[in-house]
Amino acid sequence: MKRLKEQLIETYNALNILLHEEETENKVTTATKLIVDTLKENHPFLICGNGGSASDSMHIAGELVGRFLKERKALNVICLSSNPAVITAWANDYSYEDIFARQVEAYGKKGGVLLGISTSGNSKNVIKAFEMAKSLNVKTIALTGKGGGKLSEVADILIDVPSNHTPRIQELHIMLYHYICERIEEILS
């Protein structure tokens, strides 16, 4: 059995790599600016993911529609992973692969942005959402594990963290999106 110390060292090592990657910092800064510009114009900031990434999507939306660290007005953020009626109706009648693309079609518009979270970067329904976003001139940001998988081919901005191990990827994701939420509030407050 892995000891807590070993697991913390794994996380520390992944974080240390991330800490020294200037390219990741530049991508996060660019993504944050894109999201801020979108929200300044009250265009929709859409977020999607499956499983733990769905939880992350809801977490981000909760922080930005509600508040993270500062009192401010609500922001136009929609989590595409959190409406079970829409998701199950579309998945049952059509295809699970299209559950996010259908919602992007409904809520996305030029000037908006879609954040797709996928540890592998290969979630078919997130990829299809990105394809729909492209057709609507909605910018896309992918938050993934190392390499970005197939999302790297369709994302406007790829933020891939330096790990292939799902728990470490998720730990790094939460650090990055908390940073993004904090910057958004700083700028828009």
Predicted regions and their residues:
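A ubiquitous structural signal for well-ordered alpha-helices
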Residues: Q7, A14, A31-L34, I60, ...
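A short, well-structured juxtamembrane/interface segment
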Residues: H20-E41
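Short glycine-rich phosphate-binding loop at a beta-alpha junction
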Residues: P44-C48
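Generic N-terminal amphipathic, Lys/Arg-enriched alpha-helix
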Residues: M1-E23
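Conserved hydrophobic/aromatic pocket- or pore-lining residues that grip, position, or stack substrates
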Residues: I35, G49, L64
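Structured helix-beta-strand junction loops
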Residues: A14, E41-N42, V154
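Glycine-rich phosphate-binding loops that contact phosphosugars or nucleotide phosphates
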Residues: S53, M58-S189
